[in-house]
Amino acid sequence: MKTQKANFLLAKPLLLLFAFCMPGMLAFAGKQIDLLTPKAIGLNKNWVLEKGILSPSKTPGGIIWSKEKFGDFEITLQYKTSAKANSGLFFRSDPKNAVQGGFEIQIASPGIYGGKHVVGSLYDAKEPAVAAGKPDGEWNTMKVTCKGPSIKVVLNGKPVINVDIDDWKEPRKNPDGSKNKFKTALKDLPKTGHFGLQYHGQLVWFQNIKITPLK
């Protein structure tokens, strides 16, 4: 099967355009959108789409971004990691400020990080309720649901995150008193933004990425 490669723009460090959404996509509230179709993915050398699987090419680094912004949504995807992989699903995020401009659910090899950086965590803000990540090389299934300040994550059928972002009232501080990286209180981060998938140097694979905008 002919290999198709996803659009990767390096005009700014770690910036890719993940062209999985068409203009006016927010009008399709309640309808499931398949994010991995040749028509919807911009093609180039840094991400490869082959037989329905999206993965980084040998060119290192980067985040592949959606063109459209989303607010309330449910997204499901499958991923698998290579050894010592570090990746993430960014959402309600700003491609120009990925570190500070939105949220991330950690995707990583089980066991290489702990606490609020372990697989399934709301990165640097909340550790998962249970350990749910599968070993490297096995497909994981993740569902993230955002509705207003509510963020819920289910990993491999296990609820791992169920938070109200309005509880994060102070910059650089979590409700449990621990510190985080965010210069802005999480409750004040935008309620809409882009999706991103991260490549941090070790291979990770994605498939069956589908989003349902919520009314």
Predicted regions and their residues:
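Carbohydrate-interacting regions of secretory-pathway proteins
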Residues: 27-215
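Position-driven detector of the extreme protein N-terminus
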Residues: 2, 23-26
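Bacterial N-terminal signal peptides
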Residues: 12-24
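Bacterial N-terminal signal peptides that target proteins for export
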Residues: 2-15
